[in-house]
């Protein structure tokens, strides 16, 4: 994490120099200019502050974008903390004002129930990605291409679907829509965590075994593993979604500059995958240096986020 201390610079203009022949009006003008300079500098110093960004456990784009904005905001005078929690805890925390910002709200499907519950207590800042999708993925050489064919191929996959966190929207969609629609009630649906799912995926591919996993795009796994999405002819996984940044109520008023930057933020899949891949395998204690190196390699784009 980044723990730089925000430094405020206040400029004090001294108007004590009296020149021979200067009128009192000149003196007053000098004092007024000094007051204006001090006031402007104080306003600049107040742009920073303490912020808490909430990160969804196991959601790689949540981690990547939060680490990115932690670095950007701290470079611009803020002191930033990251707090990790499951979605239900995060939405409650943002509504209660315990967290300032969450960058990974999927709409209109995945997190719709949370917006229904907390939407009038939080602020929408804007979407930064508009082609996100929930997916069911398999190894690229798997004997099926569609969810409609999966039930008949149970022996090929051991009758198992490997999922992520129990409280995830993707998990609920898989359990409530995908499984009953495609006749997969007899399959074992395993939920634990995203890292556990990715570990099973890695192991299966290394061993040349078939595997079914719940996944989503954007995700670095699509660049790292030879996998394909199963077609969803019944549309159980929904249409493409947007990834939206939300903040606690009053955030835009309290931190107008940060709110403007976050509202204007967009990031394409190529940049996101690259940052996520750089973070994969890194210890949390190394995140600062990993993100700093990535920012240096993409400095022009990063600078544009606060231009």
What annotation goes with each model-predicted range?
Residues 99-103, 166-169, 173-235:
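Ligand-binding pocket segment of bilobal, Venus flytrap-like solute-binding proteins
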Residues 133-143, 241-256:
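A bilobed periplasmic-binding-protein/Venus flytrap-type ligand-binding module shared by bacterial periplasmic
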């Amino acid at each position: 994490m980044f723990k730089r201390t925000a430094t405020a610079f206040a400029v004090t203009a001294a108007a004590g120099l009296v020149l021979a022949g200067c009128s009192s009006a000149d003196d007053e003008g000098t004092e007024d200019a000094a007051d204006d300079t001090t006031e402007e500098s104080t306003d600049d110093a107040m742009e920073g502050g303490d912020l808490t960004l909430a990160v969804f456990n196991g959601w790689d784009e949540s981690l990547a974008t939060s680490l990115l904005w932690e670095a950007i905001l701290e470079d611009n005078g803020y002191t930033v903390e990251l707090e990790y929690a499951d979605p239900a805890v995060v939405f409650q925390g943002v509504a209660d004002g315990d967290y300032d910002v969450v960058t990974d709200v999927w709409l209109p499907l995945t997190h719709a129930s949370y917006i229904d519950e907390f939407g009038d207590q939080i602020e929408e800042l804007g979407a930064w990605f508009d082609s996100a999708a929930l997916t069911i993925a398999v190894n690229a050489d798997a004997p099926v291409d569609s969810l409609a064919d999966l039930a008949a191929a149970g022996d090929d996959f051991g009758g198992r679907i490997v999922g992520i966190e129990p409280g995830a929207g993707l998990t609920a969609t898989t359990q409530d829509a995908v499984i009953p629609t495609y006749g997969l009630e007899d399959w074992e649906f395993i939920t634990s965590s995203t890292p556990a799912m990715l570990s099973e995926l890695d192991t299966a591919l290394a061993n040349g075994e078939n595997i079914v996993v719940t996944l989503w795009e954007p995700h670095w796994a699509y660049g790292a593993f030879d996998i394909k999405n199963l077609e969803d002819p019944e549309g159980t996984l929904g249409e493409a979604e947007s990834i939206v940044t939300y903040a606690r109520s009053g955030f835009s008023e309290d931190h107008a500059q940060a709110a403007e930057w976050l509202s204007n933020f967009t990031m394409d899949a190529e940049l996101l995958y690259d940052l996520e891949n750089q973070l994969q395998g890194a210890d949390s204690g190394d995140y600062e240096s990993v993100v700093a190196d990535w920012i240096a390699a993409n400095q022009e784009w990063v600078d544009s986020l606060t231009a």
